Amino acid sequence: MSDVPDDANAGCPGTGSAGAGKASGCAGCPNQGSCATGQGPPPDADVPKIQDRFSRIKHKILILSGKGGVGKSTLTSNLARALASDPSKQVAILDVDICGPSQPRMMGVEDEEVHNSADGWTPVGIQPNLTLMSIAFLLGDKNDAVIWRGARKNGMIKQFLKDVDWGEVDYLLIDTPPGTSDEHISLVQFLLQAGPLDGALIVSTPQEVSLLDVRKEVSFCVKTKVPILGVVENMARFVCPNCAHTTLLFPTSTGGAEQMCKDSNLELLAQLPLEPALAKALDNGEDFFETNPDSTLAKSFLDLAEKVKAKLV
């Protein structure tokens, strides 16, 4: 991916492209002159700070989805808990869904505050080996809308990356907003500048309306050189809690995520069932693995965690 400066216009072709400083989208950009002469913008002074923070994080995983409402944040929170079931591993969640942060509610820490010190922001502790950072902790009222343009969102994401004092972390899961917007471009750019990115998990539901956007997300990863660890199909079926009968909830007119993965040469890591008890646990900020340890879904999350760990060895 050609580099796109943080302060570039929306139509920036990238500093490494043939049209740098000359394309119509470059008009009025503060970097236009330097790009046109081949000099490019000055080095980003924050990159070394991000590199320093992330040098203590072993594995960094993006959680992506093309469409909202497919369960991306649900997957993030429960995969984090599954990974943290090993007390020897330190796990963290970074919630960069700036306009729709839901992790604090799901993790039962909605009323907590972030403390700032000379070492930076201290993420909120969920359990001894699991922490969380979200813009929701910085809002005066949890019902306040975040009405920001792209540049301000990107600035917030950069601040998360350079100012949060994570400490030593084995797995950092990054919960992103749906789509392939400014936030995704800036986030990937910053992360790749900071060092290797392990890859992305892409979340979908079985119906073609969801898969249409998943294919765009796959294209985004290819173009930005983000490795794809695999695809997770959420709400693949409903398992009756009384008789264990399985019912397909959504039509799979094109074969669902399984066929899409075959067509795209991707691995389908899990097909997670829909379980009402999970929605209740998330609304109440409870640990689903404690409230429903024997459920099919809890076991599916634990199996997924093992597959993810195997890919990161």
Curated annotation (Swiss-Prot):
Disruption phenotype: RNAi-mediated knockdown results in abnormal cilia morphology with the formation of 'wing-shaped' cilia structures and additional dendritic ciliated endings in amphid wing B (AWB) olfactory amphid neurons. GO terms for biological process: cell projection organization; iron-sulfur cluster assembly; regulation of non-motile cilium assembly. Binds 4 [4Fe-4S] clusters per heterotetramer. Contains two stable clusters in the N-termini of NUBP1 and two labile, bridging clusters between subunits of the NUBP1-NUBP2 heterotetramer. Coiled coil: none annotated. Residues 1-25 are annotated as: Disordered. InterPro entries: AAA+_ATPase, Mrp-like_CS, Mrp/NBP35_ATP-bd, NUBP1/Nbp35, P-loop_NTPase, YlxH/NBP35. Belongs to the Mrp/NBP35 ATP-binding proteins family. NUBP1/NBP35 subfamily. Component of the cytosolic iron-sulfur (Fe/S) protein assembly (CIA) machinery. Required for maturation of extramitochondrial Fe-S proteins. The NUBP1-NUBP2 heterotetramer forms a Fe-S scaffold complex, mediating the de novo assembly of an Fe-S cluster and its transfer to target apoproteins. Regulates cilium formation and structure. This is Cytosolic Fe-S cluster assembly factor NUBP1 homolog. The gene is nubp-1.
